[in-house]
Amino acid sequence: MTIADIKKNTEAKMDQSIVAFKNNLAKIRTGRANPALLDSVQVEYYGSMVPLSQVANVSLIDARTISVQPWEKGMGAKIEKAIRESELGLNPASMGDLIRVPMPPMSEERRKEMTKLARNEGEGAKVAVRNLRRDANESVKKLVKDKLASEDEQKRAEADIQKVTDKHIAEVDALVAAKEQEIMAV
């Protein structure tokens, strides 16, 4: 493995951790409806637990209401129960074969909790990025130790890896700040 490979792999892994972080952020509730909020809901389907998206179509009706359209008529009650029992604090209402999930307004205390959760997710993403930086730097040091790269190349590689790390950490900070704004907007 060359230094270029290490840098490329590290950046790709950092990009993957940012994507995972964005997915986790999408699940944090804001005052607005977001279909991704229900991604974590598991529904019993023929004896096994499956994600809601595999048994129903989830979409937005308006800024405060999510609609869930089961693909099978008999699934409505199970989907409603799964949403109600998820720890999202949502109360679905069945309207024939359509389930409406209104988003209750969040209290100030709940908003602060969600903001704290977003910050914690951000910290976790930063730690993941920093761990990837450490692993990359160790790989570069191993190349130098095995005489496959010079110390000058090591310094350059570590500086490049640090730049990539700084870029990804700045992206995490920006995403957290945007999510906090979204949560605190009434």
From Swiss-Prot:
GO CC annotations, alphabetized: cytosol
Biological process per Gene Ontology, one example term: cytoplasmic translational termination
Record CDD domains: RRF
UniProt keyword list: Cytoplasm, Protein biosynthesis
Transmembrane segments: none
One GO MF term: ribosomal large subunit binding
Matches recorded under InterPro entries: Ribosome_recyc_fac, Ribosome_recyc_fac_dom, RRF_sf
Top-rank taxon, per record: Bacteria
The protein's role, per its UniProt record: Responsible for the release of ribosomes from messenger RNA at the termination of protein biosynthesis. May increase the efficiency of translation by recycling ribosomes from one round of translation to another.
Similarity-based family: Belongs to the RRF family.
Protein name as it appears in the record: Ribosome-recycling factor
Organism: Paracidovorax citrulli (strain AAC00-1)
